[in-house]
Swiss-Prot record:
The lineage of its organism: Bacteria, Pseudomonadati, Pseudomonadota, Gammaproteobacteria, Pseudomonadales. It is an enzyme of class 3 (hydrolase). Pfam families: Urease_gamma. The keyword Transferase does not apply. This is Urease subunit gamma.
């Protein structure tokens, strides 16, 4: 299977996001990389499901709460930017203050 660097990046994000999802399900608090991966993977999947950029910008702020991440993590993630593939092309999705 030949994957482009971009496809490899998306696969890595998805895998890390899946790991974070499993840890959340076990009641563990996510660290910085896990939180970023969890939100990023959800945004990529949301774009694939047909959500708009504006919808994803809102959804991205509702995925994790302070209680679900380790202390200090919300302050370490002022924003998340990810290029997602939409039906009409690739667009940059920016989520400000993703963990409120």
């Amino acid at each position: 299977m030949d994957l482009t660097p971009r496809e490899k990046d998306k696969l890595l994000i998805f895998t890390a996001g899946l790991l974070a999802e499993r840890r959340l399900a076990r009641g563990l608090r996510l660290n910085h990389p896990e939180a970023v991966a969890y939100i990023s993977a959800a945004l990529l999947e949301g774009a694939r499901d047909g959500h708009t950029v504006a919808e994803l910008m809102h959804i991205g702020t509702t995925l994790l709460s302070r209680d679900q991440v380790m202390e200090g993590v919300p302050e370490m993630i002022p924003e998340i930017q990810i290029e997602a593939t939409f039906p009409d092309g690739t667009k940059l999705v920016t989520v400000h203050q993703p963990i409120a």
